[in-house]
A protein has these predicted regions:
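C-terminal output helix
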Residues: 89, 105, 109-118
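Receiver (REC) domain active-site loop signature in two-component systems and cognate sites
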Residues: 60
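Acidic, metal-coordinating helix/loop segments flanking the phosphotransfer/catalytic sites
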Residues: 35-53
Length: 201
């Protein structure tokens, strides 16, 4: 686990010894862990750091695991959930999975299986976060362009020649050339191949 890019596990279970055992195991593997004795205690937590995984018991005093899941859905907090339980019914397990749980694991369980599930989910989150960040950076760079410069940029990517762009945009060829220079300069891109790669990324 890369400590420079930590992953977070939120553990909700009313069994103190079970929480302590899993907490120690996860910390030893480099995860940042926060534990909670009930669904309500978790819901009172101010925020969630990402990438993250919620591991929850199904049956607890107060809100059940499924009720906690429903509350998170209602609040559009899409944290991936793995349910771990030794007493749940098949109906509860099916309901949790239908509501989007990553997995349902019965006690006793194989720790390696749980870790594989967690890491697969967190890796997927990392990839999604990287794509989202790249998209934000791209939009910030494109926002540097004036409207006409963006028009020229789009036509460049489509392979339009200078005369064709000038005709379509009702501009002079010299103006088109200037806009093209502006596009490369403002986006920090050296050539057309780089621009095409940037726009299609």
């Amino acid at each position: 686990m890369n400590s420079a890019n930590p992953s977070y596990i939120y553990l909700v279970d009313d069994d103190a010894s079970f929480r302590s055992s899993l907490n120690g195991a996860f910390i030893s593997l480099g995860y940042q862990v926060k534990t909670f004795s009930s669904a309500d205690e978790f819901l009172a937590h101010p925020d969630i750091a990402w990438p993250a995984m919620l591991i929850s018991d199904m049956r607890m005093p107060g809100k059940s695991g499924v009720e906690l899941q429903k509350k998170l859905i209602d609040e559009t907090l899409g944290i991936p959930i793995v349910f771990i339980s030794g007493e749940s019914t098949l109906e509860e397990a099916v309901q949790g999975l239908k509501q989007g749980a990553i997995d349902f694991i019965q006690k006793p369980f194989n720790m390696e299986d749980l870790l594989q599930t967690i890491e697969a989910s967190i890796e997927k989150q990392r990839q999604n976060l990287a794509k989202k960040y790249k998209s934000i950076v791209k939009e910030e760079r494109l926002a540097r362009l004036a409207p006409r410069e963006r028009d020229v940029c789009m036509l460049m990517v489509k392979g339009f020649s200078n005369p064709k762009m000038a005709d379509d945009l009702q501009l002079s060829i010299e103006t088109i050339k200037q806009y093209k220079q502006n596009v490369f300069g403002k986006l920090g891109i050296e050539d057309l191949a780089g621009l095409i790669a940037f726009m299609h990324d």
